[in-house]
């Protein structure tokens, strides 16, 4: 099993949306490295830290899992769609997506600030300056630490 961090802006799709829908397709990824992670490495059952970016605060808001392995992002071939890519064809889709299934919403967001200061997360990709990739690998230890932080009762 592998572990991932997947970023999404909450105004586009949030952990609340995933909790309501129970599953969703993760379409619209238009970065080759992120696409390669989805296409070549993500497997059904892999665990995901669901990260709310451009939020107040930005951070991990819950857990998900890969519920369907990579398949062609059909929106890439739909003319006029916001994710259309004129180079993509049904024979060579270029872009792929996976499906995510909901696991858990945390009582409070584990903020980026908390991630940066938590022991054991010093090497976590998301904490590095300039780390903008929307899909990032995380280690099992990082996943477990963030999950523990997320399940902790919020301090008042």
Predicted regions and their residues:
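Mixed-charge, low-complexity intrinsically disordered regions
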Residues: 1-9, 69-71, 116-117, 121-156
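Short, charged beta-turn/beta-strand-edge "cap" motif at the junction between a beta-strand
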Residues: 51-57
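Compositionally biased, charged N-terminal/linker segments
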Residues: 1-44, 142-143, 152-156
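Hydrophobic beta-strand signal
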Residues: 49-50, 65
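Short acidic/glycine-rich loop or secondary-structure boundary segments that cap or lie
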Residues: 14-16, 57-60, 72-75
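Aromatic- and Lys/Arg-enriched surface recognition patch
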Residues: 62-133
């Amino acid at each position: 099993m592998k572990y991932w961090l997947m970023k999404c802006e909450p105004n586009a799709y949030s952990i609340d949306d995933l909790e309501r829908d129970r599953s969703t397709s993760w379409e619209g990824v238009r970065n080759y490295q992120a696409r390669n992670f989805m296409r070549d490495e993500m497997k059904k059952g892999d665990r995901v830290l669901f990260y709310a970016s451009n939020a107040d605060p930005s951070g991990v808001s819950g857990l998900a899992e890969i519920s369907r392995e990579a398949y062609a992002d059909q929106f890439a071939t739909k003319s006029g769609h916001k994710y259309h890519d004129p180079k993509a064809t049904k024979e060579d889709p270029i872009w792929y997506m996976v499906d995510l299934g909901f696991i858990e919403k945390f009582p409070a967001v584990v903020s980026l600030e908390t991630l940066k200061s938590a022991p054991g997360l010093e090497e976590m990709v998301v904490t590095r300056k300039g780390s903008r990739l929307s899909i990032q690998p995380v280690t099992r230890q990082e996943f477990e630490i963030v999950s523990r932080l997320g399940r902790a009762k919020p301090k008042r």
